[in-house]
A protein has these predicted regions:
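Hydrophobic transmembrane alpha-helices and immediately adjacent juxtamembrane helices
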Residues: 1-266
Length: 266
């Protein structure tokens, strides 16, 4: 755990050295909620009936979708980006010279990215609340648990992408395909009931479909977690199966990279 915290701190120090960029990025995110508000207001009459079981308010519906997508984007993209960067600048070799475990290495690489995503999420939620989004704050803990479970279903996919970087120095189209399909089929901008029936069937293979439905019912409607038991069970299934697959894939890629001596080369 200490090793992971040290990596997280080092990455925060690197980001903190670009203070102007950090400030403008933060302010830009806070302001970006304004056009989302006006767009959602314009579409509210059209969307109200299709989202009646997920809050009925399109502004809150859209904000929750964008927040969830930001987290899965981090889950699938942060790890392989860190490996690519650290191999390229030689810092991975230096880190591996220390007595760090692979779980600590992965946690350290992901920790800073998720901390930054949490900060951005809070700014977006505060801005949305100030503009009148209906958020049931008493369900914040339950919503965080649901979001965490959704992220746990996507982290294994990010680990597989990192394994591709270790073995082949490229992820190929995998991360883009995952995020693209999740955005298109997972219900980020619209409920899955609004898409053609054959695509709606395909959305059942996307973890975000279950995560967003449960999150909106809880954080917008104020429903208890038990109302989304089926969706939460599906997320647990995705997380368990994909974790087992990613462990095997990453182990093989790590062993191959060490034998080939390519961990310090890009």
């Amino acid at each position: 755990m200490r090793e992971a915290m040290a990596l997280i701190r080092a990455r925060w120090l690197t980001i903190g050295s670009y203070r102007a960029q950090l400030v403008f990025s933060t302010l830009g995110l806070f302001v970006s909620v304004i056009p989302i508000y006006f767009i959602s207001r314009a579409l509210q009459p059209m969307m109200a009936s299709s989202i009646r079981d997920q809050g009925q308010e399109y502004f809150a519906f859209l904000v929750i979708g964008l927040i969830s997508f930001a987290f899965i984007n981090t889950a699938t993209g942060a790890l392989h980006a860190s490996f690519s960067s650290d191999i390229g600048n030689g810092s991975l070799e230096a880190v591996l010279a220390t007595p760090i475990t692979i779980p600590s290495l992965i946690a350290g690489m992901l920790g800073q990215a998720f901390a930054w995503t949490v900060l951005r999420t809070m700014l977006l939620l505060v801005g949305a609340t100030l503009l009148g989004a209906h958020i049931v704050w008493s369900k914040a803990l339950a919503a965080a648990l649901i979001l965490g479970l959704t992220v746990m279903a996507y982290i294994p996919l990010g680990v597989i992408a990192a394994a591709l970087v270790l073995a082949f120095r490229t992820t190929g189209p995998l991360p883009t395909a995952i995020t693209g399909l999740s955005m298109f089929l997972g219900g980020v901008y619209y409920p899955t009931s609004a898409i053609p029936s054959w695509l709606a069937q395909a959305s059942k293979a996307v973890p975000l479909t279950y995560g967003l439905r449960a999150l909106r019912r809880t954080f917008i409607d104020g429903a208890p977690m038990s109302a989304s038991a089926g969706d939460l069970a599906a997320l647990c299934g995705f997380a368990i199966v994909l974790s087992a697959v990613s462990f095997g894939v990453f182990s093989m890629a790590w062993t191959y990279a060490r034998r080939a001596g390519t961990l310090a080369q890009y």
